[in-house]
């Protein structure tokens, strides 16, 4: 199976690798995995007071397509509103990276990780209001 140039670029030069402080109230963390292949993806977002994502980081243990999907979405979501980021679909990720059908689950993981990070952020925000 041949990877596209974009997958190879994001795999060899991943963007935004690392972690944010998950204790911060404006940081949301999404941790997702694919039991079928063993890929695990952690994606974190940092959100400003205006609900714009100011930073995004990821750590992914998996194949080149999983790493490339993570790297790409961290670039895509920076500067977007939380609501706009939530609308990113795995099909858009797969199309951008020219993922073969056997690797579509990697783009789905990235979509799920975004949604999980946003849900975590929103939960923290609600808890902050209650305290």
Curated annotation (Swiss-Prot):
Pfam families: NifU_N (PF01592). It comes from the Bacteria. A scaffold on which IscS assembles Fe-S clusters. Subsequently gives the nascent cluster to other proteins. It is likely that Fe-S cluster coordination is flexible as the role of this complex is to build and then hand off Fe-S clusters. Forms a heterotetramer with IscS; each subunit of the IscS dimer contacts an IscU monomer. Belongs to the NifU family. GO terms for cellular component: cytoplasm. CDD domains: IscU_like. The gene is iscU. GO terms for biological process: iron-sulfur cluster assembly. This is Iron-sulfur cluster assembly scaffold protein IscU. GO terms for molecular function: iron ion binding; iron-sulfur cluster binding.
């Amino acid at each position: 199976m041949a990877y596209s140039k974009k997958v190879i670029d994001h795999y060899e030069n991943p963007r935004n690798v690392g972690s944010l402080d998950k204790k911060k109230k404006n940081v949301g963390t999404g941790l997702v995995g694919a039991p079928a292949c063993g890929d695990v993806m952690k994606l974190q977002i940092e959100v400003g007071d205006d609900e714009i994502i100011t930073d995004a980081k990821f750590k992914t243990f998996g194949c080149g397509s999983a790493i490339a999907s993570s790297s790409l979405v961290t670039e895509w979501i920076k500067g977007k509103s939380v609501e706009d980021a939530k609308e990113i679909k795995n099909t858009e990720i797969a199309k951008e990276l020219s993922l073969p059908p056997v690797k579509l689950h990697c783009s789905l993981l990235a979509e799920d990780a975004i949604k999980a990070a946003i849900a975590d952020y929103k939960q923290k925000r609600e808890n902050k209001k209650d305290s």
